[in-house]
């Protein structure tokens, strides 16, 4: 093409320079000025990597002054183009804009514009873009969306609760599962779903001070949720940045004490417009009608302002009726306003529970029971269902299940209360106790005697604490020269046990970090035992490394030595051997220790080894825990209640262990109290509530569905393809691990979600559960989500050119592969993507307008194509530009017809599902007062907005690929 001064060209290799202007031409060279950057480039006239830029009628162009022109016609004089059209800002027609006056900061937004401007992408990027569109659309539609990306085992009851509650508008519920059933994980799953769906953006977690770091770690490690921890220092720092310090972060964890201490701070917190608040250990909020505690009032004030509330608490039976009512009152003060009325209501639910038990028993239903069921559901004609349920006909089980579902919907608090027990959930191991009685060394005997004389002024509590840890007493007297580990028989026993069981992973827990550190040194120096240490002095990253070393099967540590505080929130199901080097002070801490191994998913029975010194507080405590509470071999829901009631006597025995008079009778008294309380708890079990909480077949179906998706290889292939194209380095490690590090030439300087020093990932859920240093990558992981956004929000892969070597077709045959996207713009909280995610429509159109896409599958066709370099590609495009324009025009009507089908189907699905959900809630609100009117109103509003936005859905060309047939 001849060059003329004033023409506009673009560089094929440096498109970031913008639009260039020809400023000098001689016989061999041409000079382009790029005004956007002020740079000049010199090119050879023949075969230079630049492309002529000429717009077409229908395009909108921008002048260097900023105004825009809709092009109606084009004229050329002496090789320079002028555009004639309508000016958008003044509506003036017949306006002439010479190409030399075009804006130099030109951005080609449409794929066809980029194609004609020579801004061609690599073929593999086009393929990645299409796959990204396809997979993203599929993922949005899955029923398990929001539930798959967590580093958790697939536990049916947890998935059921998260699926039910996570999809609600502003959920207000009580999570009251027994210990070890994963309330924290359920809460995290709900938070994760609410955030992903756009139902929540600002989340507050209020916890006891000792659990702050545990929550921080759990949210980050399991759900990839980065919370900010607010304490006095962080609050003071945030005050410099905002009038309301809590506005500086979207997701915050703070302690209840931090909020309670300062009235102004509480007001700021209440004003911060949270969408969801989680309160852990909510059973500690003391309430009575006459005198609610300050802590209760604090949470009550926040609960009045925050639309979504999750309260994590002990089981209702443990709490007692009044305390249970107090939690429900926080969730819905209008519904639960009168305690006496609440007690009366609860009595009316027993016939419902009886009816469910009857249906579950698969026995014939008598006349009295039939009348009861008719009375309970009097507003509906259930006679046909009852007849089927009471027969031997096909459909009997389905009829009974439907009746149970109908009863559950009417159950008083099953929408606001979820409570699972170990009795109702399978998958827990046995626990076996091994007591190792050891002699008390003379060194300790002497230290204890001297301590008794010197600490006469200490309280019984303080003396009891001292007596539990004789090594601490000894070390205090001896100072740095004390070496208790040289004579303590527990150390000798531990070394012997570990050397005899070198093939077993062993978790050793002791109360103090100093003890753990000293034991590590002894084990390493004396026996060469590899032991990782885990204590509160380590950073989260250091704890991760210690946990990963312990978890590793190859060259991993045999032992993990944990302090009491350091082990909070960490679980090691892959190990089944536990040694308690000493004992904790109360039953809750004991259960917390055992809970490190005793989790759902533990496949072996747990062996609990307790080496204790005779004639010490340890000997008293091990006997009390085992014989008085049965706390080692079974979970002990009564532990705290018994502990509180006998605290003074227990402390007296621990403070003076040599005085054992009456100890046996005391322990028998505790056991009797434990048995009585346990029987009361069992009697108070609510079978219907348990049935609703564990989800039954629904929960199992969710788990099976996710497990099947976990085994799909598509994610691995896509992710590795994404990392290659983005420029992320990958290094394979053993055990299904990959180390990712930023490359030198990435598509973006900083890839969101990838740390500067890299990270270790795995696509294997089980591997992620045992390797805490490895991130579990799923479709919901930030690295994948950010990768999808990076590709799809920009123009990566939006136009390409390929050669098809096929002798069955004439040379020069032209095909255009077009990817249209059907989409609707709407606020995220409407979750339009459930019905209409950005959906790709793939077309393969020839010169005659025939769409061949249905006959040519993408992946197999893509493998037959060959790449073209950018320079050759630009020449090909210029040669067939008019044909491509015509093919795109021919495709538009076909694309519109396909898009309309997609939109109509989405609208029909949305109308059916949302109307059914609304009708169900409206019908149930007549028989179940726990269905809030604001929930019904929100659903109706949501339905109307969803349908309205779907009516306005549109489509656009997202990417295209030019394919030219060759025989070479």
UniProtKB/Swiss-Prot annotation:
Classification via SMART domains: DEXDc, HELICc
Which keywords has UniProt assigned to this entry?
Activator, ATP-binding, DNA-binding, Helicase, Hydrolase, Nucleotide-binding, Transcription, Transcription regulation
Under the heading SUPFAM superfamilies, the entry gives:
P-loop containing nucleoside triphosphate hydrolases
A GO biological process of this protein is:
regulation of DNA-templated transcription
User: Where is ATP annotated to bind?
Assistant: 177-184
Keyword RNA-binding part of the UniProt annotation: no
Q: Which domain of life is it from?
A: Bacteria
> Where does the record place the Helicase C-terminal domain?
490-643
The UniProt record lists the Helicase ATP-binding domain at: 164-334
What is a GO molecular function of this protein?
ATP binding
Pfam families found in the cross-reference section: Helicase_C (PF00271), RapA_C (PF12137), SNF2-rel_dom (PF00176), Tudor_1_RapA (PF18339), Tudor_RapA (PF18337)
Q: Where is this motif: DEAH box?
A: 280-283
The record's PROSITE patterns line, in alphabetical order, gives: HELICASE_ATP_BIND_1 (PS51192), HELICASE_CTER (PS51194)
**Nucleotidyltransferase is among the record's keywords:** no
Q: What is its EC number?
A: 3.6.4.-
Family recorded in the similarity comment: Belongs to the SNF2/RAD54 helicase family. RapA subfamily.
Q: What does this protein do?
A: Transcription regulator that activates transcription by stimulating RNA polymerase (RNAP) recycling in case of stress conditions such as supercoiled DNA or high salt concentrations. Probably acts by releasing the RNAP, when it is trapped or immobilized on tightly supercoiled DNA. Does not activate transcription on linear DNA. Probably not involved in DNA repair.
How it assembles, according to the record, is: Interacts with the RNAP. Has a higher affinity for the core RNAP than for the holoenzyme. Its ATPase activity is stimulated by binding to RNAP.
Q: Which PANTHER family match?
A: DNA ANNEALING HELICASE AND ENDONUCLEASE ZRANB3 FAMILY MEMBER (PTHR45766), SWI_SNF-RELATED MATRIX-ASSOCIATED ACTIN-DEPENDENT REGULATOR OF CHROMATIN SUBFAMILY A-LIKE PROTEIN 1 (PTHR45766:SF6)
Name the chain's protein.
Answer: RNA polymerase-associated protein RapA
Tell me the organism: Erwinia tasmaniensis (strain DSM 17950 / CFBP 7177 / CIP 109463 / NCPPB 4357 / Et1/99)
Upper taxonomic classification of the species? Answer: Bacteria, Pseudomonadati, Pseudomonadota, Gammaproteobacteria, Enterobacterales
